[in-house]
Amino acid sequence: MPAKSGGVNIPVNARKTADTACIQRITLYPIKSLDGVSVAETRIAPGGSLEHDRAFAVVDAQDKFVNGKRFAEVHRLRAHFDLDTHTVTLADSGMSAPQGFRLDRDLERMEAWMSTFFGFSVTIRQDPRAGFPDDTDASGPTVISAATLATVSAWFPGATPQDMQLRFRTNLEISGVSAFWEDRLFGEPGTLVDFNVGTVAFEGVNPCQRCVVPARHPRSGIEESGFQKTLAMRREQTLPAWAARSRFNHYYRLAVNTRIPPSEAGKTLRVGDEVTILGVRRANDE
């Protein structure tokens, strides 16, 4: 049966391609704004996020996020996670001895360590149900293709696809498709793109608006002059025909924001799962 948008039937295969899109990498960011960890599989949390993704967040005395947008020092903070043992090891880019913490019982000690690192008092919040997404209207994982990361890295001398993955901090990386294939996962304003990843239902919402963080070196925090301008210019020049250009009030956008319906809670995403586009519908056609 065709999907519907604005009363007009849109063939389900209108957005399908000959490519076989599969999940190549799943990256979780257990503490918002800190380093990620790659996993082979993850479950869907009750609030529609990936389990463990941004389940913790560091906030200041005004209860505002301590993140890379506000504090470049975040980029110097290294975090290594072992989700099986609920542990994180923190270090100041090798300048101090690494310190290990249990995420299930050492939060006060970790708050003290981070307060010393930042030079002001911080608190660690926890929300295992929904996490702390930047976009609360599209709180699912962000999606990008490996080919996109490779193409974008070529726009910046000396950069690699891994550099771009660290800068853009996406959750799901897709292989087997061309650059900017993920732009098929959103439609015109007021629409959603239904797609499946394995057995998990997704809704593609919009192209992800980027902040200052990708313009900074992911380890030093030093801002790269002209990064935002170059990315926006090249995105506009290379925007594929299948992308809904009306969603770009500016072109400093990369990757796709998604939602996962409540019905999918508890299901599992795995590396190797196929991504299948089902069709486009109006956002209010539930």
Predicted regions and their residues:
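Metal-cofactor-dependent catalytic cores
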Residues: P2-E286
